[in-house]
Amino acid sequence: MKMTVDFEECLKDSPRFRAALEEVEGDVAELELKLDKLVKLCIAMIDTGKAFCLANKQFMNGIRDLAQYSSNDAVVETSLTKFSDSLQEMINFHTILFDQTQRSIKAQLQNFVKEDLRKFKDAKKQFEKVSEEKENALAKNAQVQRNKQHEVEEATNILTATRKCFRHIALDYVLQINVLQSKRRSEILKSMLSFMYAHLAFFHQGYDLFSELGPYMKDLGAQLDRLVVDAAKEKREMEQKHSTIQQKDFSSDDSKLEYNVDAANGIVMEGYLFKRASNAFKTWNRRWFSIQNNQLVYQKKFKDNPTVVVEDLRLCTVKHCEDIERRFCFEVVSPTKSCMLQADSEKLRQAWIKAVQTSIATAYREKGDESEKLDKKSSPSTGSLDSGNESKEKLLKGESALQRVQCVPGNASCCDCGLADPRWASINLGITLCIECSGIHRSLGVHFSKVRSLTLDTWEPELLKLMCELGNDVINRVYEANVEKMGIKKPQPGQRQEKEAYIKAKYVERKFVDKYSVSSSPPEQEKKVVSKDSEEKRLSIPKLGPGDQVRTSIQSSVKSNDSGIQQSSDDGRESLPSTVSANSLYEPEGERQDSSVFLDSKHLNPGLQLYRASYEKNLPKMAEALAHGADVNWANSEENKATPLIQAVLGGSLVTCEFLLQNGANVNQRDVQGRGPLHHATVLGHTGQVCLFLKRGANQHATDEEGKDPLSIAVEAANADIVTLLRLARMNEEMRESEGLYGQPGDETYQDIFRDFSQMASNNPEKLNRFQQDSQKF
């Protein structure tokens, strides 16, 4: 290492040493200025580079937008996408380069300035301080008089100590100078070398990237050459066609008079006609008319849905109109209305009249052929009739979820667009959907619509019955109540954007629901409706006592209650085959009166409407309440804070419970007595509901205010089926906990038993009547 300042000169503290120090200190000060400037320039370069990358990213987004716009042109879309991806890689390479620049230049040089140059400055301060002390000691020693021995001795000692300290610090200072002079070379070169390697990597990555892209660019260049040639050829052809058409326009108008009854697209004739409006001013508007599918329709813009003037051409006639002032008019007359039209010329008028007359004749001929075929099909032989009955019987026996659900009124077509044969369903709404509408429903989120396939998914019996209870007609009466009044047209199949807007407005914004004012009824009336039942309940609800008291209470109520679900003979809904209200456990028979006579459901708030409809097993009213914003977990403070789900349990309907659970009901929400839906279902002996709640994650360890959980209640009531279900669920829960995080979702035996109970509760509820039959023996 070459020394900048000599150690020997340092010990002498000669003028040469002082001059060398002064030169070094000036050099270090200038070095610090240069390094600070370089670091600032590096920071500015990095910031500018980041701004460049940001602008480049925005430019890439513009290229991607252009690629999406060119989705119909595969060559342009593919090329732009590929180029934007490659340029995005270059942006990433730039980002890496700027990061490496920050580490190599900014970080390293800043560290050198802050660490090494700071040590040099600290050493300089110490050296200057000890130099001053040495000068003072020399001056003091020179001033001491010879006859003052004590002072001479003291000054000599101070001078000796100061000189020793000066030499030590001066040597350290010189060492720091020499080390700094040597280190600055390595630090500067190391940072610049790292910076250059970063550039090397950047350009190497760019070279590799464009080497891969090169063949594609060459192919694209060849395609572009062909495109230029093809464009020139097409231009010549179009110029020739333009010249030919121009000559035809001047020579004849016959091309506009053609019509074709057997056209492949079904359009017999089309063109512009003036139509007289039916308003008081009788204004004439020019519209694009066409004869297609035995109908006369018109539209103003291509995107507009055609307006049907005549639905069935067989029912109309066409005639000339010479009694009005305007020329070239003719009238299409149907049994309900007439439409006055005007052509641009007499030839066009004759062509339109002939086209309408020919279409009428064709419609009669086609309809006649169809009727003949239907007559042949509707009169089979006796043998074929029998075989038809047999096949129908087989079909009913092997009935699939799709067939059962599509038999519900309105379910044979999509609920939102009307497309036939829908294969998907929204299970919380109870409607059928086509595949395109189902995709839109999925995008809404499961809190609005839960989509399931009617052909690919497994359907639980209670869910299948729920779908059969509702249906498109029921739901559309709620969610499309004001569609006609608002003049809204349902989207047609294939109109994706229109469908999305319509479905969002229908189910998310609920724009078409018939809004009714909750505040239209005085609060006193609403309170009266609720408080009558609640007052009777407060006077009659017994506490669940131990032992026989519980058994006697339950047995007296269950004599008229089924533990499963079966079809009611009068309205077809699912209900318990009981002769008294399911609330008979809590009220003496005959005390309860139906409070629904006091106020129509439209005058209740949505939460109360849902609450009452849940007990009454009225699914359409429940759907209506939810559409009006009812909270599915609304608690009735007048009736022990019972929820709609608890009311559904008391009402004895498995399907009602399933509907509430599908719409987000909390299976563990409890009333003021600490009883949740599982408690109430256990008390009432509703085995099907207990099975349903356990499958939905009900907490069977929860205790009521008397400290009883559902299992203890079932044991005291000696309900073997419910005890079996609760113990099996508890055992399965313990098995899953012991197996840890990656354990199986459930034991096969457990799943099979619960599946059997679900099937019995929905399809054969009489098999779950054992508890009722046994209780009658006591």
Curated annotation (Swiss-Prot):
<keyword id="KW-0175">Coiled coil</keyword>
<feature type="repeat" description="ANK 2">
    <location>
        <begin position="673"/>
        <end position="702"/>
    </location>
</feature>
<dbReference type="Pfam" id="PF12796">
    <property type="entry name" value="Ank_2"/>
</dbReference>
<keyword id="KW-0597">Phosphoprotein</keyword>
<dbReference type="Pfam" id="PF16746">
    <property type="entry name" value="BAR_3"/>
</dbReference>
<dbReference type="InterPro" id="IPR027267">
    <property type="entry name" value="AH/BAR_dom_sf"/>
</dbReference>
<dbReference type="InterPro" id="IPR038508">
    <property type="entry name" value="ArfGAP_dom_sf"/>
</dbReference>
<comment type="subunit">
    <text>Interacts with RAB35 (GTP-bound form); the interaction is direct and probably recruits ACAP2 to membranes. Interacts with MICALL1; the interaction is indirect through RAB35.</text>
</comment>
<keyword id="KW-0040">ANK repeat</keyword>
<dbReference type="InterPro" id="IPR001849">
    <property type="entry name" value="PH_domain"/>
</dbReference>
<dbReference type="InterPro" id="IPR037278">
    <property type="entry name" value="ARFGAP/RecO"/>
</dbReference>
<feature type="modified residue" description="Phosphoserine">
    <location>
        <position position="387"/>
    </location>
</feature>
<dbReference type="InterPro" id="IPR036770">
    <property type="entry name" value="Ankyrin_rpt-contain_sf"/>
</dbReference>
<feature type="modified residue" description="Phosphoserine">
    <location>
        <position position="384"/>
    </location>
</feature>
<feature type="modified residue" description="Phosphoserine">
    <location>
        <position position="584"/>
    </location>
</feature>
<comment type="function">
    <text>GTPase-activating protein (GAP) for ADP ribosylation factor 6 (ARF6). Doesn't show GAP activity for RAB35.</text>
</comment>
<keyword id="KW-0472">Membrane</keyword>
<keyword id="KW-0967">Endosome</keyword>
<feature type="compositionally biased region" description="Polar residues">
    <location>
        <begin position="550"/>
        <end position="569"/>
    </location>
</feature>
<feature type="domain" description="PH">
    <location>
        <begin position="266"/>
        <end position="361"/>
    </location>
</feature>
<dbReference type="GO" id="GO:0008270">
    <property type="term" value="F:zinc ion binding"/>
</dbReference>
<dbReference type="GO" id="GO:1990090">
    <property type="term" value="P:cellular response to nerve growth factor stimulus"/>
</dbReference>
<feature type="domain" description="Arf-GAP">
    <location>
        <begin position="399"/>
        <end position="520"/>
    </location>
</feature>
<keyword id="KW-0479">Metal-binding</keyword>
<keyword id="KW-1003">Cell membrane</keyword>
<feature type="compositionally biased region" description="Basic and acidic residues">
    <location>
        <begin position="524"/>
        <end position="539"/>
    </location>
</feature>
<feature type="region of interest" description="Disordered">
    <location>
        <begin position="518"/>
        <end position="596"/>
    </location>
</feature>
<keyword id="KW-0677">Repeat</keyword>
<protein>
    <recommendedName>
        <fullName>Arf-GAP with coiled-coil, ANK repeat and PH domain-containing protein 2</fullName>
    </recommendedName>
</protein>
<feature type="zinc finger region" description="C4-type">
    <location>
        <begin position="414"/>
        <end position="437"/>
    </location>
</feature>
<dbReference type="Pfam" id="PF01412">
    <property type="entry name" value="ArfGap"/>
</dbReference>
<feature type="modified residue" description="Phosphoserine">
    <location>
        <position position="581"/>
    </location>
</feature>
<dbReference type="GO" id="GO:0032456">
    <property type="term" value="P:endocytic recycling"/>
</dbReference>
<dbReference type="Pfam" id="PF00169">
    <property type="entry name" value="PH"/>
</dbReference>
<keyword id="KW-0863">Zinc-finger</keyword>
<feature type="region of interest" description="Disordered">
    <location>
        <begin position="371"/>
        <end position="391"/>
    </location>
</feature>
<dbReference type="GO" id="GO:0010008">
    <property type="term" value="C:endosome membrane"/>
</dbReference>
<keyword id="KW-0343">GTPase activation</keyword>
<feature type="modified residue" description="Phosphoserine">
    <location>
        <position position="775"/>
    </location>
</feature>
<keyword id="KW-0862">Zinc</keyword>
<feature type="repeat" description="ANK 3">
    <location>
        <begin position="706"/>
        <end position="735"/>
    </location>
</feature>
<dbReference type="InterPro" id="IPR004148">
    <property type="entry name" value="BAR_dom"/>
</dbReference>
